[in-house]
């Protein structure tokens, strides 16, 4: 089933992990352009080079950009660069974030750590939504041609990276769980506000994924691998490419009537716990 992803994507956090997998997947699926944004420009450049080697569109172009999502002006510069290079933004994937490095109960939680999580995971996502929305609102509506029929599929799609912790709580990771819950609230609110403008907003909510972020979490808690094997019904963590597959579907015309939802991709982990 072709996803018909021949537009332009902006992916933050694209220097590693899920963001990198998503950027590469867009290139392989036929996107004509991908803005590969990361705080680490060298990492973004490396992803860009890799994407060029697997791109399937004959006119594909990768645009590596340094961005600090906590800085509104930096985000605006990224979006301006995207428009100057490609004229529009069809898919915006907000993957930049920080994960768990230290496990502490709530009575030992540090305000400084909470602020750091909030700045990146929540305000960083908000900054990207605000800036990209200004572009999407003014661009033309895309059309899907299928089986001899055509239908309008909107002006653009925004996909935020949440977590299965957007729905559940895990002991000793208060800042992470709190901010990932907030990402889901932001996603739902933005979906309501932007639906009249024909812009969809959703979230993907992974469990543990084989990324540097999870490696850092394991370094902070050596018991984590055994716990993962015990509580994940599929008995393994996800690969970044498995998350990217869902991201591509959720931003494609094939999901054109889906907005305001979080798609949990966790190998069945949350099936065994009560969600909110």
Curated annotation (Swiss-Prot):
NADP(+) binds at residues 18, 68, 130, 176, 180, 209, 211. Keywords: NADP, Oxidoreductase. SUPFAM superfamilies: NAD(P)-binding Rossmann-fold domains. The active site is at residues 176, 180. PROSITE patterns: ADH_SHORT (PS00061). GO terms for molecular function: oxidoreductase activity, acting on the CH-OH group of donors, NAD or NADP as acceptor. One of its GO terms (biological process) is secondary metabolite biosynthetic process. Disruption phenotype: Abolishes the production of (2R)-annullatin F and (2R)-annullatin G but not that of (2S,9S)-annullatin D and (2S,9S)-annullatin H. It is an enzyme of class 1 (oxidoreductase). Its EC number is 1.1.1.-. It catalyses: (2R,9S)-annullatin H + A = (2R)-annullatin F + AH2. It comes from the Eukaryota. Cytochrome P450 monooxygenase; part of the gene cluster that mediates the biosynthesis of annullatin D, an alkylated aromatic polyketide with a fused dihydrobenzofuran lactone ring system that exhibits potent agonistic activities toward the cannabinoid receptors. Within the pathway, anuF is involved in the formation of (2R)-annullatin F from the diastereomer of (2S,9S)-annullatin H (compound 12). PANTHER family: SHORT-CHAIN DEHYDROGENASES/REDUCTASES FAMILY MEMBER. Belongs to the short-chain dehydrogenases/reductases (SDR) family. This is Short-chain dehydrogenase anuF. It comes from Penicillium roqueforti (strain FM164).
């Amino acid at each position: 089933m072709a996803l018909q992803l021949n537009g332009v994507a902006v992916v933050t956090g694209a220097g590693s992990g899920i963001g990198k997998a998503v950027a590469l997947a867009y290139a392989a699926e036929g996107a004509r352009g991908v803005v590969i944004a990361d705080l680490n420009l060298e990492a973004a450049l490396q992803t860009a080079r890799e994407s060029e080697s697997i791109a399937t569109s004959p006119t594909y172009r990768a645009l590596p950009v340094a961005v600090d999502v906590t800085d509104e002006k930096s985000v605006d510069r990224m979006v301006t660069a995207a428009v100057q290079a490609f004229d529009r933004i069809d898919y915006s994937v907000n993957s930049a974030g920080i994960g768990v490095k230290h496990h502490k109960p709530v009575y030992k939680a540090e305000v400084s750590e909470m602020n750091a999580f909030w700045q990146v995971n929540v305000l960083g996502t908000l900054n990207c939504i605000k800036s990209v929305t200004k572009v999407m609102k003014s661009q033309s509506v895309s059309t899907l041609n299928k089986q001899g029929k055509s239908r309008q599929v909107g002006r653009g799609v925004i996909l935020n990276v949440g977590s299965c912790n957007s729905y559940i709580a895990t002991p000793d990771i208060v800042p992470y769980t709190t901010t990932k819950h907030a990402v889901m609230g932001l996603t739902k609110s933005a979906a309501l506000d932007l639906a009249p403008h024909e812009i969809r907003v959703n979230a993907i909510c992974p469990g543990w994924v084989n990324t540097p972020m999870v490696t850092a979490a394991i370094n902070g808690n050596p018991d984590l691998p055994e716990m993962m094997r015990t509580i994940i019904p599929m008995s393994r963590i996800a690969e970044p490419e498995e998350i990217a597959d869902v991201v591509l579907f959720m931003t494609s015309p094939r999901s054109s009537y889906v907005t305001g939802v979080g798609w949990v991709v966790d190998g069945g982990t949350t099936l065994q716990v009560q969600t909110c």
